[in-house]
Amino acid sequence: MAKPFDVSKFRKGLTKSIDGVSFGFSDPTDWISTGNYALNYLISGDFNKGIPLGKVTVFAGESGAGKSYICSGNIIKAAQEQGIFVILIDSENALDEAWLKALQVDTSPEKLLKLNMAMIDHVAKTVSDFMIEYKTLAEE
């Protein structure tokens, strides 16, 4: 018979190997509306909430389904209205400044950083580097 999985040992190993790892749940307290009550409800269970801050959110779907409009127009605009600096990673290099401005997105460098990259390794490195830098600044 196989030994049961030792969760305590696994947890200790993670704690030693990954700096800053935490365990348990952290329920979001801040949300950004998608601009669509039905979509907000599908994502959060609340017509007014939408996507949670502090969590990774991915929009995927068929071409022409409206992902770019929802993310670029509604979510970025709502985030900026809450005073949030937005980092937009455009994996298809498909979003142009005129279109974003037409959706009332502030494209100034003080409000938005748009990055064009298609390789998942580049995205992962960029996000990791940003998180390290952000954590360092927050600790100062």
Where do the PLM segments sit?
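Conserved P-loop NTPase "ATPase switch" module shared by AAA+ and STAND
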Residues: 139-140
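A contiguous pocket-lining binding segment that forms or flanks enzyme active sites
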Residues: 115
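The Walker A/P-loop phosphate-binding site
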Residues: 2-110, 120-136
